[in-house]
């Protein structure tokens, strides 16, 4: 067993890179990828691609993600969360009714400017490093999609509201929280952020790590998720010996399937062989996998 998924739950207070480093040390010499960085102050689902599964990680990066986050109204911080320095204050706190009603304004495709404290690169340097050094960071606005946004709870005494968001890749929840507050004629920052789902990987099925000292290779491998799991809803064709050989060597391979398909996968003897597209019966591989039964 050397290629699979691990649905790990990242706790608050550790970076995504540090968590990957710990898992890699436990598993030994194996390639590991993940579906998108979670802030140090955030927690939640961080699916890890092990071995050949790294060839599919872009699918998870592109997948919908869901978050639950709490906004504290009345202040703005330089980082957009509780770890930053307060840079602005207002006495105006939005009403419960408005905190709920504002959600509909954000559903759909919207423009968002990533926060200065982000992992995006500016001239080869991470934006957050420039921001920490007090340098001005200019990031270009980008289009993102909010599929669903709703207020789950409003705490008048503490001036907070908790929201659920289902969104596209590239969405920054800290920026969404700030924009929500601004639309409510107030200021706000994130005090709690939890990613609850990435594609098929859900919070309730994630691996909780109480102590990193207790992790073993066996305990992780026992909770592996098959590499094909994220392909379950996608067309699959079974290859015979001749077709499999051609695909492995990058040769033209024909299938008895009349429809053109933009994205599909090929299985050989029950195992993932390749992903790609089908045009006029001809399979064009995007990625070929080196897996055994």
Curated annotation (Swiss-Prot):
Top-rank EC class of the record's enzyme: isomerase
Gene Ontology terms: biological process: mRNA pseudouridine synthesis; tRNA pseudouridine synthesis
Superkingdom in the source lineage: Bacteria
UniProt-recorded Gene Ontology molecular function terms: RNA binding; tRNA pseudouridine(55) synthase activity
Keyword list, A-Z: Isomerase, tRNA processing
Pfam families listed in its UniProt record: TruB_C_2, TruB_N
Catalytic activity: uridine(55) in tRNA = pseudouridine(55) in tRNA
The protein's Enzyme Commission number: 5.4.99.25
Active site: 39 (nucleophile)
Family that this chain belongs to: Belongs to the pseudouridine synthase TruB family. Type 1 subfamily.
Purpose: Responsible for synthesis of pseudouridine from uracil-55 in the psi GC loop of transfer RNAs.
Protein name per the record: tRNA pseudouridine synthase B
Species for this entry: Rickettsia bellii (strain OSU 85-389)
Gene: truB
């Amino acid at each position: 067993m050397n290629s699979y998924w691990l649905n790990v739950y990242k706790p608050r207070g550790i970076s995504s890179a540090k968590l990957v480093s710990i898992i890699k040390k436990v598993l030994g010499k194996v390639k590991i990828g993940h579906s998108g960085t979670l802030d140090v102050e955030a927690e939640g689902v961080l699916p890890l691609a092990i071995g050949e599964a790294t060839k599919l990680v872009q699918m998870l990066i592109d997948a919908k993600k869901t978050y639950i986050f709490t906004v504290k109204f009345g202040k703005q911080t330089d980082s957009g969360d509780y770890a930053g320095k307060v840079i602005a204050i207002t006495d105006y706190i939005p009403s419960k009714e408005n905190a709920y009603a504002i959600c509909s304004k954000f559903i759909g495709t919207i423009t968002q400017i990533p926060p200065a404290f982000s992992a995006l690169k500016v001239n080869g340097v991470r934006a957050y490093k420039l921001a920490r050094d007090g340098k001005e960071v200019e990031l270009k606005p980008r289009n993102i999609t909010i599929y669903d946004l709703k207020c789950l709870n409003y705490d008048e005494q503490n001036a907070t509201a908790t929201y659920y968001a289902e969104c596209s890749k590239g969405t920054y929840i800290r920026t969404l929280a700030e924009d929500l507050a601004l639309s409510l004629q107030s200021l706000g920052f994130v005090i709690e952020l939890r990613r609850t789902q990435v594609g098929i990987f859900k919070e309730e099925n994630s691996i909780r790590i109480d102590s990193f000292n207790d992790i073993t290779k066996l305990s992780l491998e026992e909770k592996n998720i098959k590499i094909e799991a994220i392909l379950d809803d996608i067309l699959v064709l079974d290859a015979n010996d001749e077709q499999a050989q051609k695909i492995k060597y990058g040769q033209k391979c024909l299938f008895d399937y009349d429809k053109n398909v933009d994205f599909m996968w090929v299985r050989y003897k029950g195992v993932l062989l390749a992903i790609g597209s089908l045009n006029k019966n001809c399979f064009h591989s995007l990625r070929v996998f080196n897996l055994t039964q």
